[in-house]
Amino acid sequence: MKLTATLQVVVALLICMYNLPECVSQSNDSPPSTNDWMRTLDKSGCKPRDTVVYLGEEYPESTNLQYNPRCVTVKRCSGCCNGDGQICTAVETRNTTVTVSVTGVSSSSGTNSGVSTNLQRISVTEHTKCDCIGRTTTTPTTTREPRR
């Protein structure tokens, strides 16, 4: 019985040594530090982050088109603001292009005349700078480049 308990302790120590950063960070023996707080604040703050956006929502007027992939990853503002009356909002944006496969159904006089699929570059808005602003403040608008 002692051998089994000893082996369990040894295995636990080996696992902990292999994952040393996780074992140390989960320890509550040391008091919280300003550096810990700053890391937490930085991780949760208002800033551009990788965000998955659905192309159908980016181009709602294109109901006869299907995109593949259906979604892409771009930077969008997200995070926590200190005040309850504030929201993390884009203050600078830019258009970026992504290449997708677009399938469209063309119709003539109400009848389906064909399905076509081709690769296209389309424009998606990406946030480059974020700020916490009052909820009543208007957000900047970005003009969308025409699709090619």
From Swiss-Prot:
<dbReference type="GO" id="GO:0045766">
    <property type="term" value="P:positive regulation of angiogenesis"/>
</dbReference>
<dbReference type="GO" id="GO:0008083">
    <property type="term" value="F:growth factor activity"/>
</dbReference>
<keyword id="KW-0964">Secreted</keyword>
<comment type="function">
    <text>Induces endothelial proliferation.</text>
</comment>
<keyword id="KW-0325">Glycoprotein</keyword>
<feature type="disulfide bond">
    <location>
        <begin position="81"/>
        <end position="132"/>
    </location>
</feature>
<dbReference type="InterPro" id="IPR029034">
    <property type="entry name" value="Cystine-knot_cytokine"/>
</dbReference>
<keyword id="KW-0497">Mitogen</keyword>
<feature type="glycosylation site" description="N-linked (GlcNAc...) asparagine; by host">
    <location>
        <position position="95"/>
    </location>
</feature>
<feature type="disulfide bond">
    <location>
        <begin position="77"/>
        <end position="130"/>
    </location>
</feature>
<dbReference type="GO" id="GO:0001938">
    <property type="term" value="P:positive regulation of endothelial cell proliferation"/>
</dbReference>
<keyword id="KW-0732">Signal</keyword>
<keyword id="KW-1015">Disulfide bond</keyword>
<feature type="disulfide bond">
    <location>
        <begin position="46"/>
        <end position="88"/>
    </location>
</feature>
<dbReference type="GO" id="GO:0051781">
    <property type="term" value="P:positive regulation of cell division"/>
</dbReference>
<dbReference type="GO" id="GO:0060754">
    <property type="term" value="P:positive regulation of mast cell chemotaxis"/>
</dbReference>
<dbReference type="InterPro" id="IPR023581">
    <property type="entry name" value="PD_growth_factor_CS"/>
</dbReference>
<dbReference type="GO" id="GO:0005615">
    <property type="term" value="C:extracellular space"/>
</dbReference>
<comment type="subunit">
    <text>Homodimer; disulfide-linked.</text>
</comment>
<protein>
    <recommendedName>
        <fullName>Vascular endothelial growth factor homolog</fullName>
    </recommendedName>
</protein>
<comment type="similarity">
    <text>Belongs to the PDGF/VEGF growth factor family.</text>
</comment>
<dbReference type="GO" id="GO:0050930">
    <property type="term" value="P:induction of positive chemotaxis"/>
</dbReference>
<feature type="signal peptide">
    <location>
        <begin position="1"/>
        <end position="25"/>
    </location>
</feature>
<dbReference type="GO" id="GO:0042056">
    <property type="term" value="F:chemoattractant activity"/>
</dbReference>
<dbReference type="InterPro" id="IPR000072">
    <property type="entry name" value="PDGF/VEGF_dom"/>
</dbReference>
<dbReference type="InterPro" id="IPR050507">
    <property type="entry name" value="PDGF/VEGF_growth_factor"/>
</dbReference>
<keyword id="KW-0339">Growth factor</keyword>
<dbReference type="GO" id="GO:0005172">
    <property type="term" value="F:vascular endothelial growth factor receptor binding"/>
</dbReference>
<dbReference type="Pfam" id="PF00341">
    <property type="entry name" value="PDGF"/>
</dbReference>
<dbReference type="GO" id="GO:0001666">
    <property type="term" value="P:response to hypoxia"/>
</dbReference>
<dbReference type="GO" id="GO:0016020">
    <property type="term" value="C:membrane"/>
</dbReference>
